[in-house]
């Protein structure tokens, strides 16, 4: 008899999150309001950030952060290609040019030396990615950025709960976290911008809501006139309180959620030892992994089958998988626009990486099921 389908990810939503949404629905104020303010305050306190702005998506957050930094035509922004396409999309939509850099073949994160080689007089920002829950090596990067006077935007979409040398990601500089449905903490769709730069945070807050500088709840609670003034044209990237209410509960549960992920990940590492599936390696510097993803590299020469056959084999056993990610520069638009870009480590991994199930409501029996299925496929 076939076992039930095991997805590669599933949000951990319980009665507390459902009750929090119900409370907002009954309150009479369901869009951006007090729950947003509470979420911003609690998130900033947790990571040690001076400023926090809740937003409707990490893509929207990246868009207006780049805009707030003045990124535009003629500018270059350095980013790994081995990441989700939204980063490069936002750079291009602002008229700037993404400059793709290669990554370490086994952590899938770049480093300061590789990034420095890509800097030109047109470089205006660097976007390091904390990949799969591991922390980027930040100290050399910030030293490099300070030396050249270049802004840093940490892509912390995978890094809720990640620490680097004892400090939470988001404790310095500027970072963007994602609360998408598969992330370690979720509210279906949402994000948090954090920064120690007050002027930048104020501009992001203004740009997120039409460039008004205030939202409807501000006008209600502070008695402002219904029609606030546009300071500069902005967007509609505010987060609804229904989503913020879920995120508040998830934030309180984050340590518990990440601890469960770590138990599962360590069980995977133990049970997969000796198999030719090449999990990502942990960085050698001090960091606390959030275990957002558990990624294997399925190389046909080592495994006896390619990634597509591997994923199909698991699917036939009702086990879901994912690909995180097809390298950005290999997508049709970017391949046509930047045909000269060659990133050997990125391209090797992009053709082989595969995410296997990892979410907090999994059990060790689920891990046993997945690893047993993998062993059978490779036998």
Curated annotation (Swiss-Prot):
**Where are residues bearing N6-(pyridoxal phosphate)lysine located in the sequence?**
183
Pfam families linked = DegT_DnrJ_EryC1
HAMAP family membership:
ArnB_transfer (MF_01167)
For this protein, what is any one GO molecular function term? UDP-4-amino-4-deoxy-L-arabinose aminotransferase
Organism annotation: Pseudomonas fluorescens (strain ATCC BAA-477 / NRRL B-23932 / Pf-5)
Q: What is the designated name of this protein?
A: UDP-4-amino-4-deoxy-L-arabinose--oxoglutarate aminotransferase
Domain of life, source organism: Bacteria
**UniProt keyword annotations, A-Z:** Aminotransferase, Antibiotic resistance, Lipid A biosynthesis, Lipid biosynthesis, Lipid metabolism, Lipopolysaccharide biosynthesis, Pyridoxal phosphate, Transferase
Can you cite a GO biological process for this protein?
response to antibiotic
* Enzyme Commission code(s) on record: 2.6.1.87
Q: Required cofactors, per record?
A: pyridoxal 5'-phosphate
Report the SS bond pairs.
none
Q: How does it assemble?
A: Homodimer.
This chain's function reads: Catalyzes the conversion of UDP-4-keto-arabinose (UDP-Ara4O) to UDP-4-amino-4-deoxy-L-arabinose (UDP-L-Ara4N). The modified arabinose is attached to lipid A and is required for resistance to polymyxin and cationic antimicrobial peptides.
Instruction: Extract the PANTHER family matched here.
Output: DTDP-4-AMINO-4,6-DIDEOXYGALACTOSE TRANSAMINASE, TRANSAMINASE
Reaction catalysed?
UDP-4-amino-4-deoxy-beta-L-arabinose + 2-oxoglutarate = UDP-beta-L-threo-pentopyranos-4-ulose + L-glutamate
Pathway stated in the Swiss-Prot or TrEMBL entry: Nucleotide-sugar biosynthesis; UDP-4-deoxy-4-formamido-beta-L-arabinose biosynthesis; UDP-4-deoxy-4-formamido-beta-L-arabinose from UDP-alpha-D-glucuronate: step 2/3; Bacterial outer membrane biogenesis; lipopolysaccharide biosynthesis
**Looking at the UniProt record for this protein, which Gene Ontology cellular component terms does it annotate, in alphabetical order?**
membrane
Family affiliation: Belongs to the DegT/DnrJ/EryC1 family. ArnB subfamily.
